């Protein structure tokens, strides 16, 4: 495994994930009967700061259909947590309008590179163009000075 598992921290993440899913209306317990499900959820809500009990609750009460999604969520969260420790692996997010994202994704796909690489290429292209335009402007001014013309 690439990233160290931190039981207490990850238990907190699991608790938050399950509470979020419950608030979104998903069935987080294995119980069909509403009263048993409510009782189990109330028990979970009461153990926010008790990581060992959260793991026990998961083993005893959690809906088996959530098992894989919970594992994937925690694995992704663990990766983001450890990557955030180093500036070069830290990820940032930006908000894009859908049409902008769609065009950027299409360009990235045509070039066969990631969205980040596409953005870097576009920035480098713009910087080269700006440098070229400045160089051409300077050459034009120098040429006009040599020819003795004023604008």
UniProtKB/Swiss-Prot annotation:
GO molecular function: sequence-specific DNA binding
Gene3D superfamilies linked to this entry: MatP, N-terminal domain (1.20.1270.380), Met repressor-like (1.10.1220.10)
Localization (cell): Cytoplasm
DNA-binding in keyword set: yes
GO cellular component, one term: cytoplasm
Primary location group: cytoplasm
Highest taxon, organism lineage: Bacteria
One Pfam family recorded for the sequence: MatP
Residue ranges that the Swiss-Prot or TrEMBL entry lists as coiled coil: none
Keywords of the record: Cell cycle, Cell division, Cytoplasm, DNA-binding
Biological role: Required for spatial organization of the terminus region of the chromosome (Ter macrodomain) during the cell cycle. Prevents early segregation of duplicated Ter macrodomains during cell division. Binds specifically to matS, which is a 13 bp signature motif repeated within the Ter macrodomain.
Quaternary structure note: Homodimer.
Family: Belongs to the MatP family.
Protein name: Macrodomain Ter protein
Source species: Cronobacter sakazakii (strain ATCC BAA-894)
């Amino acid at each position: 495994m690439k990233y160290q598992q931190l039981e207490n921290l990850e238990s907190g993440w699991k608790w938050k994930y399950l509470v979020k899913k419950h608030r979104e209306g998903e069935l987080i317990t294995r119980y069909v009967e509403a009263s048993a499900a409510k009782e189990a959820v109330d028990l979970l809500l009461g153990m926010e700061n008790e990581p060992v009990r959260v793991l026990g609750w998961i083993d005893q009460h959690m809906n088996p259909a959530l098992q894989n999604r919970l594992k994937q969520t925690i694995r992704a969260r663990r990766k983001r947590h450890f990557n955030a420790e180093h500036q070069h692996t830290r990820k940032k997010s930006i908000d894009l309008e859908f049409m902008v994202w769609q065009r950027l994704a299409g360009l990235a796909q045509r070039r066969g590179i990631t969205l980040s690489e596409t953005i870097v290429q576009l920035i480098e292209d713009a910087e080269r163009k700006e440098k070229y335009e400045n160089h051409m402007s300077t050459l034009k001014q120098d040429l006009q000075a040599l020819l003795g013309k004023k604008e």
